């Protein structure tokens, strides 16, 4: 099955259309080296948003069955369905947010995903949980996680250019590894899911505030040259 899917996908692939090269004074204006990017506050804002999405998604994915049995009191067989729900929501997030990223500003797509994840995390924290609300809540978190992973490379290129994307996104992608252990560390320090959910909820609020206010960096030298 996997081989058929890979071959089928490969047959559908096409080369991207050639883009005209930029010339003149504006050529390379939006391209930042890694060192230049890391001196911009926008870089660390994007890094924090990515870390938050990964931390929330990976933590919920890792402990979904435990949450179902410990907080919702579901039996083991029903709790195991969380894996299926997360997989479907993750894939849906990749498809939906990926398609939207070609039709609207990518930072707004990230904002949309954050709102969805915030709703899911709020449900886990504040709503009376039953089977339906639990599965809906973890689906919201997984939806944002999958969509963010898909959209973020292009979002980083929007802010810092394509020439050094591998380096610029590579450092931000460290948030995937860091986020994968942060939730577990917090849970082990404070014991249980509640404190971890509160931290993730707070980080989602901060990330949402960032995504609604962040602006692309501007090179001051070019600004003075144009004046």
Where are these regions (language model features)?
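Juxtamembrane helix-start elements in MFS-like secondary transporters
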Residues: 74-83, 130, 134, 165, ...
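Helix-to-loop junctions at the C-terminal end of transmembrane segments
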Residues: 94-105, 191
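Intracellular juxtamembrane helix-capping segments at the cytosolic ends
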Residues: 147-160
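Symmetry-related core transmembrane helices of the 12-TM Major Facilitator Superfamily/SLC fold
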Residues: 1-11, 195-213
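A late C-terminal transmembrane helix in Major Facilitator Superfamily
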Residues: 159-192
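Flexible cytoplasmic inter-helical loops of multi-pass small-molecule transporters
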Residues: 14-32, 220-226
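Extracytoplasmic gate region of multi-pass secondary transporters
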Residues: 35-99
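Structural signature of the two symmetry-related core transmembrane helices
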Residues: 108-123
């Amino acid at each position: 099955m996997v081989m058929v899917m890979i071959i089928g996908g490969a047959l559908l692939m096409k080369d991207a259309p050639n883009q005209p090269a930029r010339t003149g004074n504006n050529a390379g204006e939006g391209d930042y080296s890694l060192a230049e990017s890391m001196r911009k506050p926008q870089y660390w804002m994007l890094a924090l948003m990515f870390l938050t999405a990964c931390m929330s998604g990976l933590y919920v994915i890792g402990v979904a069955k435990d949450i179902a049995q410990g907080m919702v009191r579901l039996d083991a067989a029903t709790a195991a369905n969380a894996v299926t729900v997360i997989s479907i929501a993750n894939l849906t997030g990749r498809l939906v947010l990926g398609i939207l990223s070609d039709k609207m500003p990518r930072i707004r797509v990230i904002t949309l995903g954050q709102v969805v994840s915030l709703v899911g995390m709020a449900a886990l924290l504040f709503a009376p949980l039953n089977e339906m609300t639990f599965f809906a809540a973890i689906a919201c978190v997984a939806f944002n996680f999958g969509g963010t992973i898909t959209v973020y490379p292009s979002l980083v290129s929007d802010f810092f250019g394509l020439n050094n994307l591998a380096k610029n996104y590579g450092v931000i992608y460290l948030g995937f590894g860091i986020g994968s252990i942060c939730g577990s560390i917090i849970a082990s320090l404070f014991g249980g899911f509640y404190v971890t959910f509160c931290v993730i909820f707070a980080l989602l609020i901060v990330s949402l505030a960032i995504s609604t206010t962040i602006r692309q960096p501007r090179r001051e030298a070019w600004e003075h040259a144009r004046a």
